[in-house]
Amino acid sequence: MNTNNEETFYQAMRRKGVSRRSFLKYCSLAATSLGLGAAMTPRIAWALENKPRIPVVWIHGLECTCCTESFIRSSHPLAKDVILSLISLDYDDTLMAAAGTQAEEVFEDILSRYHGRYILAVEGNPPLGEQGMFCISGGRPFIEKAKRAAAGASAIIAWGTCASWGCVQAARPNPTQATPIDKVITDKPIVKVPGCPPIPDVMSAIITYMVTFDRLPELDRLGRPLMFYGQRIHDKCYRRAHFDAGEFVESWDDDAARKGYCLYKMGCKGPTTYNACSTTRWNGGVSFPIQSGHGCLGCSENGFWDRGSFYSRVVDIPQMGTHSTADTVGLTALGVVASSVGVHAVASAVNQHNRHKQQLADAGQQSPDNEDKQA
């Protein structure tokens, strides 16, 4: 792969015949995908014109490669622009042409040549059981390779739920002792990008942000970028109105399902899952699981794999009940008023009865018979 890291992104794009207009359009799309607005387009353009491409080392532990499969389908920006122009992806044993001894020589060369300058991207996690022998890369335990690469990295990106939380290979009883990367690398800044897999446009946007601003994006307390993990899927879901109205799918392919009602009762984990699925969507913004008729699995949340069936809801959440009609609300209000009037009438009658008894008692004390008895 190209190791000319002094070339800027803009120079690489121009070398490929990309016009200035197309470059600025790319910067505008990048700003939009990052949620920065059009005002930040000039800053992104300046950064991509003047800053050398950042070398990236991408390594794989226990995983299924779904993060890479997702990343190469990025549309804003395109994965080819990220890989071939925005960054210098010098090592990735899935995408690179080299293999075996040649690949390991490239790995060692990058670590020494760009020590302290490269970004380490980790897909999958290291198993610690049996001295790490459950995952071997380059003839040695993956945990050794991860620590070796992390030592000279400026920052680490933990791609996917595997690297961020452990995922299915860490499911109970976790015989391989699969461990999230932040539990074994504790002296480097780590950006967690969970999801099984993460959204491709989120992956490329995070790289764009780090290249543009020379810093990590703002993170939440769990280490996730707030720009993409700051809200629940439920908060922006197009079926949210049905949730608020108490309109739910009760069984697959019932009339409510055909009407697009809320999937919460079918096990949707959207109310407890932080991700950008309902806003960014997948496949270039075409759709996401809930839009396709299936509830969210909560795959970007820690421990989702050990929380029971995907089709049972975790908790009961009270709804607003906005499905009530004006007549229903009116009858309810009338009932409340009638009840209040009834209670007031009963209370008044009781008070009046008590006053009447007191008056009779007072009158009895002042009667002639009582006066004669007293005399």
Swiss-Prot record:
Name the UniProt record assigns to this protein: Hydrogenase-1 small chain
Assembly information from the UniProt record: Heterodimer of a large and a small subunit.
InterPro entries assigned: Cytochrome-c3_hydrogenase_C (IPR027394), NADH_UbQ_OxRdtase-like_20kDa (IPR006137), NiFe-Hase_small_C_sf (IPR037148), NiFe_Hase_small_N_sf (IPR037024), NiFe_hydrogenase_ssu (IPR001821), TAT_signal (IPR006311), TAT_signal_bac_arc (IPR019546)
The record's free-text note on cofactor binding: Binds 2 [4Fe-4S] clusters. Binds 1 [3Fe-4S] cluster.
Family according to the record: Belongs to the [NiFe]/[NiFeSe] hydrogenase small subunit family.
Keyword set includes Metal-binding: yes
Subcellular location as annotated: Cell membrane
Recorded superkingdom: Bacteria
Membrane topology annotation: Peripheral membrane protein
Sorted UniProt keywords: 3Fe-4S, 4Fe-4S, Cell membrane, Iron, Iron-sulfur, Membrane, Metal-binding, Oxidoreductase, Signal
Reaction equations catalysed: H2 + A = AH2
Signal peptide range: 1-47
Residue numbers spanned by region Disordered: 353-375
A single GO molecular function term of this UniProt record: hydrogenase (acceptor) activity
Organism: Citrobacter freundii
Binding site for [4Fe-4S] cluster 2: H234, C237, C262, C268
Binding annotation for [3Fe-4S] cluster: C277, C296, C299
GO cellular component: [Ni-Fe] hydrogenase complex; ferredoxin hydrogenase complex; plasma membrane
Named cofactor requirement(s): [4Fe-4S] cluster; [3Fe-4S] cluster
EC number(s) from the headed UniProt entry: 1.12.99.6
Binding, [4Fe-4S] cluster 1: C64, C67, C162, C196
Keyword Ligase included in the entry's annotation: no
BP terms from Gene Ontology: anaerobic respiration
PTM comment: Predicted to be exported by the Tat system. The position of the signal peptide cleavage has not been experimentally proven.
